[in-house]
Amino acid sequence: MAEALLRRRLEERGIKARVASAGLLPGGAPATEAAIETMAADGLDISEHVSRQVSPSLLEASHLVITMTRQQLVELTVLEPAAWPRMFQIRDLVWRSEQVGPWPPSEPFADWLRAVGRDRNRSELLSAPLSDDVADPIGQSAAFYERTRRVLDDLLSRLATLV
């Protein structure tokens, strides 16, 4: 869901970026029917989506990695510690980005992202509030999927105005 929402918001702003999703579980699973229906109601077709598992090489090649939960961020940091400066939990990323302000395209994206991540410490992951997490809707009601879609769309819309 987040992949399709972010791609749409970036395209609306004329931003060319490669957006891909990957998870901690083994790949190969299609999007759930509830996710397909929720996104279709918002004009997005994710019916061809197939999950894939994240790998150290994917993390290494990514300019930005966004997780839904702090636990995912912890696990990815363990998987590829060198990618830590480019990995953020979504709410934390949006909040920090709003504090720094929009990325000036005349500067390298990596410089802006370093400013966004300034003063972050990995030890925060152990004490950070879980209330920042975006809950996984799998197995939940259609209403839960819709709430998750709205939360993600709000966060990703805000992020798209900054990158």
Predicted features along the sequence, with ranges:
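Short secondary-structure boundary segments
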Residues: 69-70, 91
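Conserved active-site segments centered on acidic
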Residues: 1-62, 70-85, 157, 161-162
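Phosphate-binding/catalytic loops
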Residues: 77-163
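Acidic side chains
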Residues: 45, 63, 132-136
